[in-house]
Amino acid sequence: MITGGASGLGRAAASEFIQHGAQVIIADVDSQQGPQVAKVLGPEAQFVCCDVSVEAQVAEAVDTAMASHGKLDIMFNNAGIAGKAIPPGIADLDLAEFDRVMGVNVRGAIAGIKHAARVMIPVGSGSILCTASISGLMGGLGPHPYSISKFAIPGIVKAISYELCQYGVRINCISPSPIPTPQVVSQLSMFYPGATQEQIAKIVNGLGELKGTKCEESDIAHAALYLASDEAKYVTGHNLVVDGGFTCFKALGFPSPDQVV
């Protein structure tokens, strides 16, 4: 099951998993696009309308997976929101907005973990994934509510891995670098109102440090497939950073010798 599977990273992951023989439940709040995506992906995909901030809907989505397939091997807690594109400073932070972002990004992920564990623990196997972000590794890369929510995810994964290890269930997360997904492009279009989608995508792709390539949705889908597969059978509690070196260093801005008087 993939939450937020109707677009962006979730849709790419759904396609990747299906190509490798999985049957996928797309759990998404978008009741218009979700069924269309499931239809495009084929008979191996099934759509379930799910707002992850409402625990009962997460529980129902997991129950649907169990009713349809008899088991849940992989739970990918991918649904997330960024909040306001041009957020206020901390002194003017809207705590209602903060709660909204945390409700989806953190509480929603915990609900997914909880109900996946509910059905995985009895069978002694399963893989749980969560989407984190490099905004949860460094400050200044996103709005405060979003960054704080993403800082929480690796901690949640490590804390819960301790318990799940006892039952043979693995849990990991992925921290992608910026990718011009529909959500990212939509957010930045408010910041760059005169820019085209192609121009915004170029800006986002230009943020990378690893030259000659760029981070794409398929890169995160491949990372998710690896962590969910038996190839990663001894990997748990891990935050797989897919950022082309973005968070590895900060170059010192020394002036060149000819600039020094």
Where do the protein language model's features map onto the residues?
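Active-site helix of classical SDR
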Residues: I113, S149, V157
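Alpha-helical segment proximal to the catalytic Tyr-Lys
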Residues: R118, Y162-Q166, K233
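Residue(s) in the substrate-gating loop at a strand-loop-helix junction
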Residues: S133
